[in-house]
């Protein structure tokens, strides 16, 4: 089984040198000079993976995946990253992995079934760290104040569900 990662540095030569040092036959690296885009993508995919899985079915989840990628592109550009980063390993690659398994996807499944965040955490995931929820608490005040609900409705819906402990309502 091979694993892949992205090494990001403003100086692409440094990123490639680091990648060459850590690459093996089973651990491959890609390179990027979009440090902001890579860092932000790797964080927000945790939120969007919960949204995707909340769809409770492949057809709905595929539509939520598409809309999530659209919102990620908007957010990456908003924070001065490169939109192409969203379409690479740090963006949709990492989003896919997070959506098909892991703690964020489990939480998304519970939210999609009608549990509030606190109910699901207490009943099913008491000992688990939910990175997307931790991030939601950190970024919600900024997102609510600075970013239009019309630009990122999925993100806003999940932030409200987690921060206000409401049932997740996605109007998409």
Predicted regions and their residues:
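NAD(P)-dependent Rossmann-like dehydrogenase/reductase catalytic/cofactor-binding core
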Residues: 35, 45, 52-53, 77-172
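Internal alpha-helical scaffold of NAD(P)-dependent oxidoreductase catalytic cores
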Residues: 2-85
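Short, surface-exposed connector motifs at secondary-structure boundaries
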Residues: 1-2, 154
